[in-house]
């Protein structure tokens, strides 16, 4: 799934961390941001 802004990607990543008990990497793609994508690394969410 592609998120248009970083804030939306962070919220989704935090939700995924809780549900799956894992770390989530956010990457930049042509149309916004992806979780576990193959683009440029932006940040890792651990919460």
Residue ranges and their predicted role:
Residues 2-23:
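A short, charged, amphipathic alpha-helix used as a generic interaction element across diverse proteins
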Residues 18-47:
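Short N-terminal "domain-start" leader segments
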